[in-house]
């Protein structure tokens, strides 16, 4: 099984050969979840984002995979990291934005 379905199916992101799509996405997701686990830092947007993220790995249930969700929320993620002085998160976000979005 790959992040895009059974191993016999072609990968969706073939143009990103040589880029660790899964690893970079998971690093960014970990930084986001670290912050929004604190109810004081979360809001309705992040709760909805977490619900969509939970379905992102379910090929038949998802409306978007994790990379699509991340790329669609760049502005919100940037604001979250800026508000929390998360330089590591911002660095990962810039890399994801430059290499994948």
UniProtKB/Swiss-Prot annotation:
Induction: Up-regulated by RcoM in the presence of CO. Its expression is enhanced in the presence of a poor nitrogen source, like glutamate, that allows nif derepression.
UniProt superkingdom: Bacteria
InterPro entries: CowN
Keywords: Nitrogen fixation
GO biological process: cellular response to carbon monoxide; nitrogen fixation
Disulfide bridge partners, by residue number: none
Phenotype reported upon loss of the gene: Strains lacking this gene are not able to grow with N(2) as a nitrogen source in the presence of CO.
NCBIfam families hit by this protein: N2Fix_CO_CowN
Function per UniProt: Is required to sustain N(2)-dependent growth in the presence of low levels of carbon monoxide (CO). Probably acts by protecting the N(2) fixation ability of the nitrogenase complex, which is inactivated in the presence of CO. Is not required for CO-dependent growth.
Family of the protein in this entry: Belongs to the CowN family.
Annotated protein name in UniProt: N(2)-fixation sustaining protein CowN
Lineage: Bacteria, Pseudomonadati, Pseudomonadota, Alphaproteobacteria, Rhodospirillales
Gene: cowN
């Amino acid at each position: 099984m790959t992040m895009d379905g059974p191993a016999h199916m072609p990968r969706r992101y073939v143009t990103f050969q040589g880029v660790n799509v899964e690893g970079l996405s998971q690093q960014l997701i970990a930084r986001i979840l670290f912050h929004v686990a604190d109810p004081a830092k979360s809001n309705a947007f992040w709760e909805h984002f977490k619900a969509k993220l939970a379905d992102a790995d379910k090929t038949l249930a998802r409306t978007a995979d994790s990379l699509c969700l991340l790329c669609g929320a760049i502005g919100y993620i940037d604001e979250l990291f800026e508000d929390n002085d998360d330089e590591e998160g911002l660095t990962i976000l810039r890399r994801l934005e430059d290499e994948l979005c």
